[in-house]
Amino acid sequence: MKQSMVFSPTLREVPADAEIKSHQLLLRAGFMRQNASGIYSFLPFGLKVLHKVERIVREEMERAGAVELLMPAMQAAELWQESGRWYSYGSELMRMKDRNAREFALGATHEEVITDLVRDEVKSYKKLPLTLYQIQTKFRDEQRPRFGLLRGREFLMKDAYSFHATQESLDEVYDRLYKAYSNIFARCGLNFRAVIADSGAMGGKDTHEFMVLSDVGEDTIAYSDTSDYAANIEMAPVVATYTKSDEAEKALEKVATPDQKAIEEVSAFLNIEAEKCIKSMVFKVDEKLVVVLVRGDHEVNDVKVKNVYGASVVELASHEEVKELLNCEVGSLGPIGVTGDIEIIADHAVASIVNGCSGANEEGFHYVNVNPERDFKVSQYTDLRFIQEGDQSPDGNGTILFARGIEVGHVFKLGTRYSEAMNATFLDENGKTQPLIMGCYGIGVSRTVAAIAEQFNDENGLVWPKAVAPFHVHVIPVNMKSDAQREMGENIYNSLQEQGYEVLLDDRAERAGVKFADADLFGLPVRVTVGKKADEGIVEVKVRATGESEEVKVEELQTYIANILK
């Protein structure tokens, strides 16, 4: 492709609203442009990268036995109502009405549509297992779109769905697609980890996220320093043991703590360690209010609270709800005096506290010498806190460290969550009606493009891995007015294309500095500069990833480039 004919508008300045490198560079290099908040156009170079990621995804999905189809973006509300998610999915689901006032959703995901499709067509175990996938635009009304393609309102996603007669069949396909995902992200050149995850609004169990390691990631990964264990911090169980001291219990005492609300403030004011304080929080668990206790140096993990109750929705109670429930402000909350009809659950660590401290449910006061079970009753002790760095790894090997990650893929064993709700059944080999067993497998295709850009860049621009680069080689005749340089550049361009390489020829009448700056910004793997030594049959070859350059004879160029790109 000749650069003079390409639509690739570059920017010299960083856009003010672009916070992270991938967003900045994809805009500056002319790979995309914003249409509205969280909505982007892919320009020609960006689209080439997107298509290459799509191709890798398709190759690995088909190798894993999945078959491609395409489902509608507009989905009838009745299907979502049938599954129960019309009401539980939340405000991220974009809803609309047609001219006849019939309700629809713009697809955030396609479980309902695929289940409806398959239940009408697959009636026997003889047609199972079946794995179908699509690459389709998705829509989510994000409250705060940010980070460019990483959190948008419209994005490209590969979603696959598998249907099975047995759990063993699901396990087999799940493992196969898990490996396919690992192959996809490895082929894209990404540094990633597959981690144990929470299924969230998707439902189901046994789920893994594929996380690209990046400091700008919105998720925290807890991983072992000596084993392969890795999990989203929300899902990492705490296996610590807590020893109760033999300190004698003291008499409960209420003390004034004016203007001291946070644990750090209270512990400093009372000269008591944070680990001896009891942090009390009120959660709304499917409309039921529950008091949750953790140690003062720990944080409540709301996903674990949700899992204790098998709840659909868990959120912090509002200040007004806390006031009505306990007649106090949030900063003065405590378990003492909570009436019997309000359930108290506590993290295991709370049980070991002796002569601790808690809020007194009265503004400006706390209790000291608090002892669980003597001063208040707990209905259940369980794992309720976030794991911390330095904790023992849940697999028993090593200690936990943290890293940030960008989620680019997620695989779920849905089980019969959707098939039972939507009456999607088949006849088994005994002629009995059974619900279809399902799996679900998603990849953020456009998000993967951003994740690659986030991992592969330097101070001068993008540095694309060869598998997804829009072109393999960038040929730059420095002076287009020079017949020797121009003709050599075109000859190299043509010969490399004949060898199967994708080549970009900078045939613009621009200054050398502009051409080189754009080349660095675009980030193609190899740059061939045709300069003053063209008359001698010599060009300069530069590797974008390393910055290494070498003068090469034209007759040796194809072999040289082949060694770089092998």
Swiss-Prot record:
This is Proline--tRNA ligase. One of its GO terms (biological process) is prolyl-tRNA aminoacylation. Homodimer. GO terms for cellular component: cytosol. Catalyzes the attachment of proline to tRNA(Pro) in a two-step reaction: proline is first activated by ATP to form Pro-AMP and then transferred to the acceptor end of tRNA(Pro). As ProRS can inadvertently accommodate and process non-cognate amino acids such as alanine and cysteine, to avoid such errors it has two additional distinct editing activities against alanine. One activity is designated as 'pretransfer' editing and involves the tRNA(Pro)-independent hydrolysis of activated Ala-AMP. Belongs to the class-II aminoacyl-tRNA synthetase family. ProS type 1 subfamily. It catalyses: tRNA(Pro) + L-proline + ATP = L-prolyl-tRNA(Pro) + AMP + diphosphate. Signal peptide: none annotated. Its EC number is 6.1.1.15. The keyword Translocase does not apply. Consists of three domains: the N-terminal catalytic domain, the editing domain and the C-terminal anticodon-binding domain. It is found in: Cytoplasm. It is an enzyme of class 6 (ligase). Keywords: Aminoacyl-tRNA synthetase, ATP-binding, Cytoplasm, Ligase, Nucleotide-binding, Protein biosynthesis. One of its GO terms (molecular function) is catalytic activity, acting on a protein. CDD domains: ProRS-INS, ProRS_anticodon_short, ProRS_core_prok.
